[in-house]
């Protein structure tokens, strides 16, 4: 199961991911973010680390890890002591993926990033990271379910042979062939500010 120490900096390497939506970037040392209805202004090293952590950031430094702990307590950073793709999978599955619908200059997406955004933007229901991995692993086209008004057919497709209890799909997708490439595509979308975590 996913896990890891949250505040124990004596264990060594810590990996973090930013939570919340970047609203305004004045500089690398002053930003305004929104998370769960609240607005936060981060300054100095806190702002710098939050920006670095948008697509994952790993550190051994005691000073950085102290800042990690402070940002975690504020609810704007998630962290794990597993600095690998499994750790990133655990961080992503313990949060909600949200689409950044703010206007601005956006470059077109290709390949897997485009497919993930189609699922998340056009879907009739919210999808978890493990559900996205399942859909990509099974090469399910987002357009097939366009007329599925409430996402019932999609849910049946995902959970057709599974009991939807105790994170069964999350545990199953830990060993999925497409887990790492899907996680990496999601991290790129986070870095491009197309997605954010809650």
Q: Where are the language model's segments positioned?
A:
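Short, amphipathic alpha-helical interface elements at domain boundaries
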Residues: 3-54
């Amino acid at each position: 199961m996913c896990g890891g120490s949250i505040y124990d900096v004596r264990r060594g390497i810590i990996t973090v991911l930013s939570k919340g939506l970047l609203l305004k970037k004045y500089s690398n040392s002053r930003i305004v973010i929104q998370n769960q209805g609240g607005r936060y202004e981060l300054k100095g090293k806190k702002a710098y680390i939050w920006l670095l952590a948008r697509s994952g950031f790993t550190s051994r430094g005691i000073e950085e890890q102290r800042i990690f702990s402070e940002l975690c307590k504020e609810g704007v950073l998630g962290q794990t002591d597993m600095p690998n793709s499994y750790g990133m999978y655990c961080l992503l599955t313990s949060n909600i993926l949200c689409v950044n619908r703010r206007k601005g200059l956006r470059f077109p997406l290709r390949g897997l990033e485009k497919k993930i955004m189609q699922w998340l933007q056009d879907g009739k229901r919210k999808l978890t990271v493990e559900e996205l991995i399942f859909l990509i692993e099974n090469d399910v086209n987002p357009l097939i379910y366009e007329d599925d008004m409430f996402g019932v057919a999609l849910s049946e497709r995902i959970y057709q042979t599974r009991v939807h209890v105790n994170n069964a799909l999350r545990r199953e997708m830990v060993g999925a062939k497409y887990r790492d490439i899907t996680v990496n595509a999601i991290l790129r979308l986070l870095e491009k500010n197309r997605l954010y975590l809650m």
